[in-house]
């Protein structure tokens, strides 16, 4: 059971990979949004032993290339409402706000909600065209 949390930003993302009980599979690292880097990320995640689920916040349109590339490579991907991540574990006294901390929080969310996660479905062309008109 490998939970991948991705904190999406414009042009790059922070990736953290955790297992239950806080075991760090891969220390947090940055990946760019170029096709080559996203394809390399997909291969790296697919090479990890065990079932892997990728979770990210759906933030504007920035998440779409990441989600689509990972989904098309055969990985389980889920884009969740950022409010769910914000509210998750929000009772901490320490308010750490870094990309690394956010990616790890998203990975912990994935582990705690493993059974309820539904796989990402990319938008069809018509829906995507309508969305981009806004």
Where are these regions (language model features)?
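Phosphate- and other anionic-substrate recognition elements at nucleic-acid/protein interfaces
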Residues: 1-134
């Amino acid at each position: 059971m490998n939970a991948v949390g991705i904190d999406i930003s414009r042009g790059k993302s922070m990736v953290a990979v955790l297992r239950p009980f806080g075991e760090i599979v891969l220390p947090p690292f940055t990946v760019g949004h170029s096709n080559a880097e996203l394809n390399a990320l997909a291969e790296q995640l697919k090479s990890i032993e065990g079932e892997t689920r990728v979770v990210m916040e759906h933030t504007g349109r920035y998440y779409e290339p990441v989600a689509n590339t990972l989904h098309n490579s055969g990985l389980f991907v889920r884009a969740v409402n950022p409010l769910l991540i914000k509210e998750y574990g929000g009772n901490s006294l320490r308010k750490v706000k870094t990309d690394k901390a956010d990616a790890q929080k998203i990975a912990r969310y994935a582990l705690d909600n493993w059974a309820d996660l539904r796989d990402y479905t990319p938008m069809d062309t018509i829906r995507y065209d309508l969305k981009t008109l806004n």
